[in-house]
Amino acid sequence: PYDREKIWRHLNEMQRGNRATLTDRVIGVIDLALWDLAGRALKLPVHKLLGGFRAKVPAYASTMCGDELEGGLNSPQAYADFALKCRERGYKAFKIHTRMPPIPGTPSPKEDVAICAAVREAVGPDMALMLDCFHWYSREEAYYIGKALEKLNYAWLEEPMDEHNMASYVWLTENLTIPILGPESAEGQLFTRAEWIRQGASDLSRAGVMDVGGITPVMKIAHLCEANGVRLELHSPGAGNLQCLMAMGIPGEYYERGLLHPFLDYEEPSPWLNTLDDPMDDEGYVHVSDRPGLGQDINWGYIKENATGH
């Protein structure tokens, strides 16, 4: 576990002829395991191995995509009501994933703007709000949404267009004042992030341990962003991303906590864990564990009972 860089480079090179099976997600799982093993062997949490910078970080409530369920996220008012519920829980920021296919009539720029407006009206001016469009829109549609969000004082617009078309993101970033966040799903690990920064394709960068191949490349991206004065927001919850956030010198502003929905109790840990990876206090801060490795309190009994092989 102490040769993580060597192993990551080897896997990255092997990926060139095996991309269909040796995906970034597979490499990410291996890299996470190596960091966890190293921390456990040295009796240190991973964020301390990475350098250590903070012990807590503010979280944003990240919703599930909208639905057609009674009592779910089925209307602008439903999103507004849920935002108020999240604010009562302690969240200082709220990110919207709007409705998308196969729901009839979606994706819809006008519906997205209506949802965003309803949420802003409900929570007032002080709660940070964001929108994730999940790459559904054209340049014109993304521009329309972005201009509306500027008037609503949203913190960022995330992944509104297909990320394979970097030129469209350069155009959008140049023509809007709201910060554009990306790339999230574009292939290319740290190399794609470097090119987006060079070309000015977004204002804020984006990566996650399961998107780019683990903690090792995420920290490379963090240092790349630091050198260029660009904030890095990490994608998705989880112990790996949380450990990285606690070690980033120029931090991402938030930890993504979710995905949240009116029907779900996020405060209940997954059955393979005894406690949450990301406990949040009443002020909206997520605290990192000082347990060795990734800091997870694993329910080994559950894992043994549900193992499918050896």
Task: Briefly describe each language-model feature range.
Residues I27, G105-S108, L131-H135, E158-M161, ...:
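Glycine- and other small-residue-rich loops at beta-strand/loop junctions that grip anionic moieties
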Residues D290-H310:
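Extended hydrophobic packing segments that form well-structured cores
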Residues K6, G17, N153, H164-Y285:
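Shared catalytic-loop signature of beta/alpha-barrel
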Residues K56-V57, A61-V170, N175-L176:
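Metal-dependent enolase-superfamily TIM-barrel catalytic cores that perform enediolate-based chemistry
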Residues D31-G66, E70:
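Glycine-rich, aromatic-flanked loop segments that form ligand/cofactor-binding clefts
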Residues P1-L42:
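Metal- or metallocofactor-binding catalytic centers and their adjacent structured scaffolds
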Residues A41-L44, L49, Q77-A78, G90, ...:
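Ligand-binding pocket scaffold of soluble enzyme catalytic domains
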Residues I30, K43, F94, D132, ...:
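Conserved, mostly hydrophobic/aromatic
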